[in-house]
C-alpha cells in the first residue's frame, strides 16, 4: 500500500475542492483517504492505494485542480507512513 500526503495551495477553499477531490478518487477508483481544510487556507489530502499508477493519476489530477472553480498554485507531495 502506497500512501501520500498532499498539501495544496491556491484558491482551494470555498470552491468545492474537497468534494471534487472525493469525486475524483471515486472516479479513478482504488484511492482511499481523507481531505480537509487547514486554517492557513490550504487543503490537506491523505491518500493511499495498492495501485501506484492510479495514485500517480490522482496526484496529477489534483495538481490540475479537480474543481473548475479552484486555482491550484502549488502541491507539496510527501510519502506518508
Residue positions per predicted region:
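Intrinsically disordered, low-complexity, mixed-charge
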Residues: 1-81
